[in-house]
Amino acid sequence: MEIQRALVITGIAVVSYLMIQAWQRDYANTASPVPVEQVAEQGNSSSSDSADLPSVQSQTDNSIPSAQSDNDLPSVSPADIAQPTPSSQRIEVNTDVLRVEINPVGGDIVRLALPDYPKHVDTPDQPFVLMDQNSNGTYVAQSGLVGKNGTDSSKGRPHWNSAQQSYRLAEGDNELNVDLTLTQDSGAEIIKRYTFEKGSYLIRVSHIVRNNGSTPWTGALYGQIKRDGRDDPGLSKAGFAPMPTYLGAAYWSADKPYNKLTFDDMSEDDVKLDQTVEGGWLAMVQHYFVSAWIPDAKQKNHYSSVYLKSRDQYLLRFVSPNTTIQPGEESVLYSEFYAGPKQQDNLEAISPGLNMTVDYGWLWFISQPIFALLVFLQSGEVSVFGMDIDIGGGVGNWGVAIILLTLIIKAIFFKLSATSYRSMAKMRKVAPEMQRIKEQNKNDKQKQQMETMNLFKREKINPLGGCLPMLVQMPVFIALYYVLLESVELRQAPFFLWINDLSVMDPYFVLPILMGASMFLQTRLNPTPADPTQAQVMKWMPMIFAVFMLWFPAGLVLYWLTNNILSIAQQWIITRNIENSA
């Protein structure tokens, strides 16, 4: 029995240790943040923004790019060079799922809000702001043309012209184009076009170059995400103990589908990104949401990262190969930009591997089918090759779906659990005999162990049979933890009564208290350990776990509570049958 109890305690300790290690390895950002400098809402001076721009002449230079040579400077007139502009001149774009603001200086996305995802469950009319540039910090998407005839350089960035100050996707329309225009001294006309689609968080960014000049036009497309090192504004907070999630960069490459690049990595010269990738994507990942550049999949683009130490800003960028356009010809340099929720099916359809930004950790192969089953129970939909098929029968409530999922998991492990509870019941039945053996041979440990093993053999008891089945189920619990923590579908998902968000802690601690009470009842069905120390540990374990669960997502505690109730019922029936047997 001591072996059994020791293994149970060891299993709990190992699981807790692995969870803490996973948090620290994958999610913790231990770098001390540098105070963010005051940033004007529109990126005030041309020099401050241009210092962040990539250089096609020296793509291996991972420091802040220097000015290019004179003959490589862009052919923009002084009037086109960026000047400070008031925030009122931002171009506003509204679709059914996006609220976007574009700065004419550079044509950058400097604010992006998601009306379908409120900032707080109690303020449904206040959308979550994913990207923004203001005095509190910077998180923007930049793009442009660099090179000999590019629009962006160390000299500054262009001021794009727009026919309208505000754009809105009209009801009944499926697409909205926002055109920013620029004419270079060489005669080249450039249109920077943002294309928004109904119901989509994917934005097509096209640079249409019409070479009306007399000489070839040469340039390259770049796109980058610039973000400061502040905390994730969308982080789920639970009292004084926020649930930690990954905050940092990620990218796709052919040799490794999913690569994390933490902010600490980006600040180190020997770790930062610097490679050529065919297709792929670069992303800034945070809790529930992601922003990502998806370059032309047919091109080999140069991926790099830069850390601006003085401003505590991190840049993740790509630069395409040079494009040459002959006089009288036209060409389109394009990429795509995604900014929105981490919806797995949508992300997979956009670019291979982008759905991996929903980080289920090292047990992803268990988490993914659990999530698929949970979605089916809630909505009645199944995903086949990226297509959602509505079979019907969904319960329409994520909390009820979690309860049904628990029933299914419990049914799968029914026999294993029965083996465990049967072993525990037998141990409880022979506990008086074990105590007698211990007292009779308290001075002879070897004889005590021998007689105890003979007792186990005679009663057909496996001392490990009670704990090993429990340990087998632990990976499922950890995988479900990641599902409930990472899946944006459960963000602000209500259950019943006081629980209006299953992704955060129970505000009144009702579920953790009930979970602790259920654990206490379950321990009463187990044999009391002979060792006083182990007995004390098992006595206080329900309270310790109840306190530990106070700050866990309510959905996870609901799963554990439901599982405990089912386990108690199963164990009570098995224990009663064995104790009543001859």
From Swiss-Prot:
Biased composition (Polar residues): 59-74
Alphabetized UniProt keyword annotations: Cell inner membrane, Cell membrane, Chaperone, Membrane, Protein transport, Transmembrane, Transmembrane helix, Transport
Transmembrane parts of this sequence: 3-23, 357-377, 394-414, 464-484, 495-515, 541-561
Top-rank taxon, per record: Bacteria
Subcellular location: Cell inner membrane
Cysteine disulfide partners in this protein: none
Stretches for region Disordered: 38-92
InterPro entries xref list: Membr_insert_YidC (IPR019998), Membr_insert_YidC_N (IPR028053), YidC/ALB3/OXA1/COX18 (IPR001708), YidC/Oxa/ALB_C (IPR028055), YidC_ALB_C (IPR047196), YidC_periplasmic_sf (IPR038221)
Any one cellular-component term (Gene Ontology): plasma membrane
Pfam families in the record: 60KD_IMP, YidC_periplas
Entry keyword annotation includes RNA-binding: no
CDD domains the record matches: 5TM_YidC_Alb3, EcYidC-like_peri
Membrane topology classification: Multi-pass membrane protein
Chief location bin: membrane
Biological process terms in GO annotation: protein insertion into membrane; protein transport
Compositionally biased residues, Low complexity: 45-58
GO function term, MF aspect, one: membrane insertase activity
Gene3D superfamilies per record: 2.70.98.90
Function summary: Required for the insertion and/or proper folding and/or complex formation of integral membrane proteins into the membrane. Involved in integration of membrane proteins that insert both dependently and independently of the Sec translocase complex, as well as at least some lipoproteins. Aids folding of multispanning membrane proteins.
UniProt-listed NCBIfam families: PRK01318.1-3, yidC_nterm, yidC_oxa1_cterm
Family: Belongs to the OXA1/ALB3/YidC family. Type 1 subfamily.
Subunit and interaction comment: Interacts with the Sec translocase complex via SecD. Specifically interacts with transmembrane segments of nascent integral membrane proteins during membrane integration.
Protein name (record): Membrane protein insertase YidC
Annotated organism of origin: Alcanivorax borkumensis (strain ATCC 700651 / DSM 11573 / NCIMB 13689 / SK2)
